[in-house]
Regions:
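Conserved N-terminal/central alpha/beta ligand/cofactor-binding core
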Residues: 42, 48-49, 54-137, 141, ...
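N-terminal Rossmann-fold NAD(P) dinucleotide-binding loop
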Residues: 36
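Flavin (FAD/FMN)-binding glycine-rich loop and adjacent Rossmann-like elements that form
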Residues: 21, 62, 115, 153-159, ...
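Bacterial Sec-dependent signal peptides at the C-terminal "C-region" and cleavage site
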Residues: 13-24
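Bacterial N-terminal signal peptides that target proteins for export
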Residues: 1-10
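Conserved beta-strand-loop-beta-strand element in the redox core of flavoprotein oxidoreductases
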Residues: 139-154
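Beta1/beta-strand and adjacent pyrophosphate-binding region of the FAD-binding site
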Residues: 23-33
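Extracytoplasmic Gram-positive cell-surface binding/anchoring modules and repeats
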Residues: 465-476, 480-505
Length: 506
C-alpha cells in the first residue's frame, strides 16, 4: 500500500511540476548528472522550454549525488557554467582559498552545498525539475520524442538529451555505441565522514576482510616495499590519507585510490538486478575501509556524516562511475587528437576544454598489469569537438555526460567534472538552437553554438593567454577555432597547458 501511495504522489508531483509548461517541452533532459544539469540550465537560458528528470532528490550527479565533491582539473580554465558554479562555491565559503581544504584538489565542498548551488542555478534559469522520478519508455515521434515517466506521466519533446551517469538513455533509444572498451574503470562508492569527537560504535560490515585495506597507507600492517605497497602505489601517512579529501567544513571525503574504496566490476554489462547487488557489495567494500580506519588505525571517532546525504545509511545516492556507454558520434575525440590537435579539423568545432591527465583507475581489476600503461598518461590541455554530443544516426537526440563519443583511453580525461560540465553546457546550447530552428542537431553549424558559448564566457580552446572577461578573449578564441592562431600544448606533471604565446620565462 505504501509503495502505491508513493507512486501516486510521484505522479501528482510530476503533473504539478509540468503544469507551468504543459506536457510538451522543447528540450527534455533525462538524468541530472553534472552534464545533464548544465545542459538544462543552458537550454533554458537560451529560451527553450526545458525540463529535467532525475531519479534522486539532487542535481549534479558525480559532483553531488555520488559524493565526489573535489573537482579535478580546469582550475585555470574556469569559464561558463563551471566557472559560475565554482564562483558560487567560493562565495559560500568565503573565497577560493577556503576551497583548498584538501590536497586532492583546489576546489572542495560539501556535496549538499553543491547540490543547493546547482538547484538554485536551475530554478533561476526556469528549468522544470522533476526529481525523485525516472523515465520508463521512449517513443520516437515525427517531431521528436514522447517519454513516459514513472507513474505514467508523458512528456513530448523536440530534443531529448541523455544526462545520465551511464548512458542509459542512449542505450534505450538505440543510439550506435563505440565498442572499444577493454574493461570498465574501477568505480568508487564514496563516503563523507566526520569526526564526532568521541568513539563511534562500529559494526563489522558483512564480508569484512582487513587484508583488503592494510596497504592503504603507511602503517605497521602494510607491506612496505621502499615506500610503496605491492601494487606500486606510494604509502602515504595516515594523516595525509585523510587530509586528501578534507572538505572546507571539516568533513572528509573518502575517495582514496590506494587499496581503499575503489571497486572493480563490469557494471556496464550487468542487468538492473545484477547492478543492484554490485552496488550493495561496493557499499560494503567502502564500509569495510571505514571499519578498518576505526578499528585498526585508531580513528574511532570517525563515522558516516549524518548531515550530508538524506539517505537511510548516510551514503551517497549511487557510486562514482568513471565509465559509461559511449555513443558513436559525428566526431570522436581520441588521445591522438589531444596530443596532436592540428592533425585534424576537430579543433574548429571545439566547445569544451580540459587539462587533466589520462586518469584511469584499474588497480582493483584482475587485469591491471595489462592496463598499466593507461595510468596518468601524459597529454596537453585539450578541446572537445561538438560532434561528440551528436549520435551519427539517432534524430532529435544528444548526450551531455560521460556517454560522449570519445575513445576509451581518452575517457580517462573527458570523464572529469569540468569537462562534462562544459560538454553539458554545449549540449544545452545546441539543443535550444535545434529546437528553435527545427533543425536536427547535426545540421546546426558548430559556429552557432560557439557564438553562444562565447557570449556566456566559455572557453572553446584551452589557451591560457587570456581568460573570460579579459579584453581580446573572444577574439583569440574565435581566431583559434578558425585556425588563424594556434596554441602550443605541453604536459608538466599534473599541470597540462596550452599557450598561443608561451610565457617569456619558459
Amino acid at each position: 500500500m505504501e509503495k502505491i501511495r508513493i507512486k501516486t504522489l510521484t505522479a501528482l508531483l510530476c503533473a504539478c511540476a509540468l503544469s507551468g509548461c504543459g506536457r510538451s517541452v522543447d528540450v527534455l533532459i533525462i538524468g541530472g548528472g553534472a552534464g545533464g544539469t548544465c545542459a538544462a540550465i543552458e537550454a533554458a537560458r537560451n529560451g527553450a522550454r526545458t525540463c529535467i528528470v532525475e531519479e534522486t532528490p539532487w542535481l549534479g550527479g558525480m559532483l553531488t549525488s555520488a559524493g565526489v565533491s573535489a573537482i579535478d582539473g580546469n582550475y585555470r580554465l574556469r569559464g561558463g557554467l563551471f566557472g559560475e558554479f565554482t564562483d558560487s562555491l567560493a562565495a559560500r565559503y568565503g573565497g577560493y582559498d577556503a576551497l583548498r581544504s584538501g590536497w586532492v584538489s583546489n576546489i572542495l565542498f560539501n556535496p549538499r552545498t553543491g547540490a543547493d548551488v546547482l538547484r538554485n542555478m536551475a530554478d533561476g534559469a526556469g528549468v522544470r525539475c522533476l526529481t525523485g522520478t525516472s523515465a520508463r519508455e521512449f517513443r520516437k515521434t515525427r517531431s521528436g520524442w514522447s517519454v513516459t515517466l514513472t507513474g505514467g506521466t508523458r512528456i513530448r519533446t523536440r530534443i531529448l538529451v541523455d544526462g545520465t551517469e551511464l548512458g542509459d538513455v542512449a542505450e534505450a533509444v538505440g543510439a550506435d555505441e563505440l565498442r572499444d572498451r577493454i574493461s570498465a574503470q574501477d568505480l568508487t562508492y564514496v563516503a563523507i565522514v566526520k569526526d564526532y569527537g568521541h568513539p563511534v560504535a562500529a559494526a563489522e560490515p558483512e564480508g569484512y576482510d582487513k587484508d583488503l585495506y592494510v596497504n592503504c597507507c603507511d602503517n605497521p600492517m602494510a607491506t612496505n616495499l621502499d615506500g610503496k605497497n605491492p601494487l606500486g602505489q606510494k604509502l602515504w601517512s595516515p594523516g595525509m590519507m585523510l587530509s586528501y579529501g578534507r572538505l572546507p567544513d571539516g568533513h572528509i571525503m573518502l575517495n582514496w585510490p590506494v587499496c581503499a574504496n575503489d571497486y572493480f566490476a563490469e557494471y556496464l554489462d550487468m542487468t538492473r538486478e545484477q547492478r543492484g547487488e554490485m552496488i550493495r557489495q561496493a557499499k560494503l567494500h567502502t564500509l569495510g575501509y571505514l571499519y578498518f580506519l576505526q578499528t585498526e588505525l585508531g580513528f574511532n571517532s570517525l563515522g558516516i556524516a549524518d548531515d550530508v546525504f538524506p539517505t537511510e545509511d548516510g551514503l551517497p545516492f549511487y557510486p562514482y562511475y568513471r565509465e559509461a556507454r559511449r555513443i558513436a558520434g559525428c566526431d570522436t575525440m581520441t588521445v591522438e587528437a589531444a596530443r596532436n590537435p592540428y592533425d585534424s579539423d576537430l579543433y574548429t568545432r571545439a566547445i569544451a576544454v580540459g587539462d587533466y591527465p589520462l586518469d584511469h583507475h584499474h588497480m582493483q581489476n584482475p587485469r591491471r598489469e595489462e592496463l598499466g600503461h593507461l595510468w596518468y598518461g601524459k597529454i596537453p590541455s585539450f578541446s572537445v569537438p561538438m560532434g561528440v554530443l551528436i549520435p551519427v544516426a539517432t534524430d532529435n537526440f544528444l548526450v551531455a555526460d560521460k556517454a560522449a563519443s570519445v575513445d576509451w583511453e581518452m575517457n580517462g580525461s573527458t570523464r572529469l567534472q569540468p569537462v562534462v560540465m562544459g560538454m553539458g553546457q554545449a549540449a544545452g546550447a545546441l539543443a535550444a538552437l535545434s529546437a528553435r530552428s527545427r533543425r536536427q542537431p547535426r545540421e546546426v553549424p558548430a559556429s552557432e553554438v560557439q557564438a553562444i558559448l562565447l557570449d556566456h564566457g566559455c572557453y572553446l580552446l584551452p589557451f591560457l593567454d587570456l581568460k573570460p572577461g579579459d579584453p581580446g578573449f573572444r577574439e583569440l578564441q574565435e581566431k583559434g577555432v578558425k585556425g588563424e592562431v594556434k596554441g602550443t600544448g605541453r604536459s608538466i606533471d599534473w599541470t597540462n597547458e596550452t599557450w598561443v604565446n608561451l610565457p617569456e620565462n619558459e
